[in-house]
């Protein structure tokens, strides 16, 4: 399925407190806290990174999911200055955008056998370049259609569906929330949650990982609980 992905992240300092408020704001729990493993693939010459695309296999609970993401504006492909990427020697870099909202076209589908697809990727010349893990809790919001146009960027296909979701991610380097939906709904939800828009981010987890490495001097290569042990990794992986 292909969808328009419009989202913002913000750091969470009180995960339990935030979750306790969500039902009163019209959110419904979609998926309880579930362990998630992600692997990004690219060619040895980083062909996908050069055009701001990602190819990912995700293991989410019992599910395997393959995802491709690309910029909503083809003119931004391959232009680090426009996309806001900070390229470096790390394979985690180059998979983020910087704007008021992060806007991507996402195509994904469920898999029966993730390792089999990984083997196919290998035969086609794609190799694992970055791994990241988190515990994710998914909430959805049933909002009446009062937001007006979902998005006015002519580069974004108008026929693509846009949901309204909030996900809570517990990563080895901190907790983050992602709001995904029409910009008007995102802005209204941030206000209802009391989140300062100045604290919001469009960085990918790869970029957040690089920032963390620069601050800490850590030599690790992946954003995983094995490489960055935290108390979160000691909690049950499935509720």
Q: What annotation goes with each model-predicted range?
A:
Residues 166-173, 180:
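A contiguous pocket-lining binding segment that forms or flanks enzyme active sites
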Residues 83, 87, 192-194:
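Edge beta-strand at a domain terminus
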Residues 5-7, 173-176:
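Phosphate/nucleotide-binding catalytic core
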Residues 184, 190-201:
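A hydrophobic, small-residue-rich beta->alpha segment in the mid-to-C-terminal subdomain
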Residues 108, 178-180:
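Active-site scaffold segments
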Residues 12-15, 182-186:
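Helix N-cap motif at beta-to-alpha junctions
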Residues 59-61, 172, 183:
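A generic beta-sheet turn/junction motif
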Residues 1-80, 87-163, 199-239:
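N-terminal strand-loop-strand beta-hairpin
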